[in-house]
Amino acid sequence: MQTPKRRRGAQGCPRSSPSPPLLLLVRAVWFCAALSVAAGSFELTILHTNDVHARVEQTSRDSGKCTGQDCYGGVARRATKIRELRAKHRHVLLLDAGDQYQGTVWFNFFKGREVVKFMNSLRYDAMALGNHEFDNGLAGLLDPLLKHANFPILSANIRPKGSIASNISGYILPYKIINVGSEKVGIIGYTTKETPVLSNPGPYLEFRDEVEELQNHANKLTTLGVNKIIALGHSGFSEDQRIARKVKGVDVVVGGHTNTFLYTGSPPSTEVAAGNYPFMVQSDDGRQVPVVQAYAFGKYLGYLNVIFDDKGNVIKSSGNPILLNKDISEDQDIKAEVNKMKIQLHNYSSQEIGKTIVYLNGTTQACRFHECNLGNLICDAVIYNNVRHPDDNEWNHVSMCIVNGGGIRSPIDERTNNGTITLEELTAVLPFGGTFDLLQIKGSALKQAFEHSVHRHGEGMGELLQVSGIKVVYDLSRKPGSRVLSLNVLCTECRVPTYVPLEKEKTYKLLLPSFLAAGGDGYHMLKGDSSNHSSGNLDISIVGDYIKRMGKVFPAVEGRMIFSAGTLFQAQLFLTWGLCVSLLYFIL
């Protein structure tokens, strides 16, 4: 922070009385310093959440169902910390960067009413739309969220087309100017332009380039005399950084979508930091722009303090996400409202399906980066559901299943309730209500799909394919588009099923989520037409029936997906290089 000039800081200082001189001198110095800061700067505290995904109740360490003592998050605990920080700081904004919808039985049952109720109760100041806010179509966004929220809902890069424009006019705003004390703060929203392939917004919404639209509205705000601008949105950490670099006038970026954990210092829980908090980006016009996210699932509350000079420039930013653990009590009024709504859920969510005797790893860190045993279980269940009577040529008509890692939304802990799996827990794993469909596809297109699976591996996106009836070997040291070293599939025209090399010109049958069959997550090569695509059963019904039939499940990680020695060598090389640089730094 820049030190104010002495003459300016001295203006208006009271004269000291002779008695008692020391006490009065201290008070005078304190008062003058406070006056100096107030005259030349403005401090803003930004509390923020992103990717909460219907975690109304407190959760386990890995954001599944919590029944023990080691619990995190939940709206009641968040309310306590927000109230505390509002009392501590004078100028506070509470913001959400999207994806409040979808993820637990709460959303499946209440369809977003729970989101509106508790966001209103916590008095959010603004929210940006995430892709999952469109999971129930535009109608499911309009009512309840858009019609009943007591706070502005923002996205500058969504443009309605045709008659739909009049239906949502005034509900989705590009920006909002909020009076904070004597200052005006502009907040511009943005939503990932990948939303049409990630969710269900329908054909009448256009998702434009984030940077271009943000710049247009930042220019408008500047013209209106607003010199403190926050970009609040849901496009992922890489896009957040691009916005910070490219958009003139944006002072702070509050993001979401990639569940990015940023932290300065030693992390307080199991999440590994992707960088410091705030993550500082130098803009193309030479400014330092803080970029923040707060992981996901309401486990943390983002906590950023920003000091602006009198021209609206950021001169200091600091903070860290606050871990909402058991040391923070739950607000009893909010807790009572949660329990009241929970009564309606009980019969729906408490149905017992079966048991697991192993941890079903459905975490982001597992299923989006490598083979996960919950992905194996899901696809094995889908194959089992499609076993038919053999004939003279085939033991079964289909042997292969894929599911995108981003479609697996929660783990199931075998140490909770003696391994009992309830409908609530299974709904948290597969919350989207999709089907597993049958597709006929050429081997060349399937190979292309597996290249797409790892084209940006390591960024935590949801495209990585979990499989059954397929064995794939990747080399991430190669360029995207040429990373599949081998792809073997389980034969069907055989008496003893074995894995054989994929034939590019052969047509195969493949089981996959309806989301992927519609081209979701960028899998345009899987998008089928009515001649080669047959709709199947509900995903949660398929997996639930399989678990019921098995009674107890214990899926393993089996080497269905392998990253080659070349990839491992590259990782070791980067690690060694990083250690050498660190060692050299300390030596010098």
From Swiss-Prot:
How does it get modified post-translation? Venom 5'-nucleotidases (or a part thereof) may be released into the venom via exosome-like vesicles. They may be attached via a GPI anchor to the membrane of these vesicles. Soluble forms of 5'-nucleotidase might be released by cleavage of the ectodomain in the exosome-like vesicles or venom gland cells.
Q: Please report a single Pfam family linked to this protein.
A: Metallophos
On tissue specificity, the annotation reads: Expressed by the venom gland.
Q: Which residue(s) hold a covalent lipid per the annotation (GPI-anchor amidated serine)?
A: S564
**What is this enzyme's EC?**
3.1.3.5
Identify the PROSITE patterns for this entry: 5_NUCLEOTIDASE_1, 5_NUCLEOTIDASE_2
Which Gene Ontology MF annotations are present? 5'-nucleotidase activity; metal ion binding; nucleotide binding
Site Transition state stabilizer: which residues?
A: H132, D135
Q: What does this protein do?
A: Hydrolyzes nucleotides into nucleosides. Snake venom 5'-nucleotidases are widely distributed among venomous snake taxa, but there is a lack of information about their biological activities. They have been shown to inhibit platelet aggregation. This effect may be due to the liberation of inhibitory AMP or adenosine by its action on ADP released upon initiation of aggregation. Venom 5'-nucleotidases are also known to synergistically act in vivo with other toxins like ADPases, phospholipases, and disintegrins to exert a more pronounced anti-coagulant effect.
Q: What PANTHER family does the annotation carry?
A: 5'-NUCLEOTIDASE, 5'-NUCLEOTIDASE-RELATED
What family is reported?
Belongs to the 5'-nucleotidase family.
What name does this protein carry?
A: Snake venom 5'-nucleotidase
Organism phylogeny: Eukaryota, Metazoa, Chordata, Craniata, Vertebrata
